Swiss-Prot record:
PANTHER family in alphabetical order: N-ACETYLGLUTAMATE SYNTHASE, N-ACETYLGLUTAMATE SYNTHASE, MITOCHONDRIAL
Reaction equations catalysed: N-acetyl-L-glutamate + ATP = N-acetyl-L-glutamyl 5-phosphate + ADP
Protein name (record): Acetylglutamate kinase
Compartment annotation: Cytoplasm
Residues that coordinate or bind ATP: D181, V182, S183, G184, I185, L186, I209, I210, T211
Keywords attached to this entry: Amino-acid biosynthesis, Arginine biosynthesis, ATP-binding, Cytoplasm, Kinase, Nucleotide-binding, Transferase
Gene Ontology CC terms: cytoplasm
GO biological process: arginine biosynthetic process via ornithine; L-arginine biosynthetic process
Classification via Pfam families: AA_kinase (PF00696)
Similarity field: Belongs to the acetylglutamate kinase family. ArgB subfamily.
GO molecular function annotations of the record: acetylglutamate kinase activity; ATP binding
Top-level taxon: Bacteria
Length: 258
């Protein structure tokens, strides 16, 4: 079996029917032409934010990571492992793709511990067991994995989806693409940067060009590239016609080098 490809979906994508239609059409086209097994890992920040708003609950962030108090973890689990995950499974079904919905704890695929008591139920993801997902891939299924995990003590944890995807890629020896709303990392003039090293990233963070959530994304991609010993791509789902080429290894966004 070729080494798998993990496609990590950014939260806003789940809010856009047009984006989902483009993505799943690209997935169908790619699967018809290539044997490479695919896995989707998703967060769903926008789904969670919308639910929090409806329930009048505060959304707090610390260094770009969502603070998850004990009284909110059930709600966030429902939004990510429930609504967001099943929405993606429904789109897969609509496009004739046999898919299976999972969370990080299924088959111990990704091990999770608490990251920081101040963040509450926020987990640190580490590689786990490849057995379950490899079994599903061998059966021709598309695993769709939410970024909810569970500790050995049975505590549910909200995990940053970029970091969850990195840990799963390390588990499976997979390549990783981080799909988001931006066409890659942009320089001070709004131009796409084709390749990025750790040194270049540090400079741009110091200069205030890479900020907030993008710092988390770049650091996750750098961590992933280091952990996996191979480049990681950050790209946009907006260029659907380019996605099959991206899935096949052609960079269309920013390639993060280890």
């Amino acid at each position: 079996m070729m080494n798998p490809l993990i496609i990590k979906l950014g939260g806003v994508l789940l809010d856009s029917e047009e984006a989902l239609e483009r993505l799943f059409t690209a997935l169908v086209n790619y699967r018809e032409a290539h044997q490479r097994p695919l896995i989707i890992v998703h967060g769903g920040g926008c789904v969670v934010d919308e639910l929090m708003k409806q329930l009048n609950l505060p959304v707090q962030k610390k260094n770009g990571l969502r603070v998850t108090p004990a009284e909110q973890i059930d709600i966030i689990t429902g939004a990510l492992a429930g609504t967001a995950n099943k929405t993606l499974l429904a789109w897969a079904k609509k496009h004739g793709i046999s898919s299976v919905g999972l969370f990080l704890g299924d088959g111990d695929s990704v091990k999770v511990t608490q990251l920081d008591a101040e963040l509450g139920h926020v987990g640190l993801a580490q590689p786990g067991s490849p057995t379950l997902i490899n079994t599903l891939l061998a059966g021709g299924y598309l695993p769709v994995v939410s970024s909810i995990g569970v500790t050995d003590e049975g505590q549910l944890m909200n995990v940053n989806a970029d970091q969850a995807a990195t840990a799963l890629a390390a588990t499976l020896g997979a390549d990783l693409i981080l799909l988001s709303d931006v066409s890659g990392i942009l320089d001070g003039k709004g131009q796409r940067i084709a390749e990025m090293t750790a040194e270049k990233a540090e400079q741009l963070i110091e200069q205030g060009i890479i900020t907030d959530g993008m710092i988390v994304k770049v650091n996750a991609a750098l961590d992933a590239a280091r952990a996996l010993g191979r480049p990681v791509d950050i790209a946009s789902w907006r260029h659907a016609e380019q996605l099959p080429a991206l899935f096949n290894g052609t960079p269309i966004g920013t390639r993060i080098l280890a």
